[in-house]
């Protein structure tokens, strides 16, 4: 029997746990600085690190992918450029992110966080689908709340050395096709898309629906108001009101429907850990009850 509930984890989940994996921390890290210095004499038209640094005001991981896309667009106006050099820089960017995340301290977990509470709930229900857009290894957390086998990592993991970085499918110079996530050998979107469309309840925790991940979610919001859609409720857990506004903006871009139309088709709620943490805990406790009931149904013998 297919699980009726799907959980999507984004970088906000890691941050809520207390893991220092923010995009800003990466840009300020010695790993990024090292490669910035290595390419300091590289011409502007092929200096990917310098381009990303100049656009660092975007403070989510969607920022690096947005910068890569903008860089690809920028090169369209250049007749000749060293794309082999750009690919070399891109691979070093992947290396820098991997090194930065390898140094994350898993011992400073906030055990009172909503994210930790959610892990405790999910541990009880093996029938729940869990997808993570993070590279981090939850199995390294104290107490091993969830084995990695329970989580499908959309962008790969550091442990498996198959991390995916890049942009959504779009028209860019053919020589820069290595920027596209779909060109990665470990790219997997089919399972996530099919699972989302079959789910009755979906929880996005710390994922802003950033446009760099639009390939994964366009189908969800395109089909959400169709008669055959299974989706009944979608919850989003974000940090604050600013994150909520960004979320709504991204949903508007992804969907053929207005937010009002979507809310006529499904129950859609946004919870903010910074503004009203009590409401987040209440939602998760109700989710716990819902999963308990669905687990009983899931395990019922046939006949």
Language model feature labels by segment:
Residues 2-6, 11-201, 207-303:
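Conserved catalytic-core helix/loop/strand module for nucleotide-ribose chemistry
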């Amino acid at each position: 029997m297919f699980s009726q509930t799907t959980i999507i984890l984004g970088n906000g989940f890691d941050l809520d746990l207390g893991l220092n994996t923010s995009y800003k921390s990466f840009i300020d890290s010695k790993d990024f600085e090292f490669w910035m210095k290595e390419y300091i004499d590289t011409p502007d038209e092929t200096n990917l690190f310098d381009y990303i640094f100049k656009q660092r005001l975007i403070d989510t991981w969607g920022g690096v992918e947005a910068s890569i896309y903008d860089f690809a667009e920028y090169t369209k106006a250049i007749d000749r450029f060293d794309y082999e050099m750009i690919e070399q820089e891109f691979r070093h960017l992947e290396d820098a992110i991997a090194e930065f995340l390898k140094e994350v301290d898993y011992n400073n977990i906030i055990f009172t966080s909503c994210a930790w509470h959610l892990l405790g709930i999910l541990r009880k229900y093996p029938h729940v689908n869990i997808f993570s857009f993070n590279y981090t290894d939850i199995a390294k957390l104290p107490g091993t709340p969830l084995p990695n086998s329970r989580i499908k990592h959309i962008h790969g993991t550091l442990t498996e050395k198959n991390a995916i970085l890049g942009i959504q499918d779009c028209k860019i110079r053919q020589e820069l096709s290595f920027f596209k996530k779909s060109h990665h050998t470990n790219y997997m979107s089919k399972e996530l898309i099919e699972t989302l469309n079959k789910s009755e309840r979906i929880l996005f925790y710390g994922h802003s629906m950033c446009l760099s991940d639009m390939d994964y979610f366009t189908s969800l919001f395109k089909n959400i108001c169709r008669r055959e859609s299974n989706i009944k409720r979608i919850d989003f857990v974000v940090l604050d009101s600013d994150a909520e506004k960004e979320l709504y903006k991204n949903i508007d871009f992804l969907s053929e429907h207005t937010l009002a139309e979507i809310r006529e088709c499904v129950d859609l709620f946004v919870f903010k850990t910074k503004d009203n943490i009590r409401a987040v805990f209440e939602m998760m406790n109700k989710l716990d009850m819902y999963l308990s009931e669905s687990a009983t149904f899931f395990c019922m013998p046939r006949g």
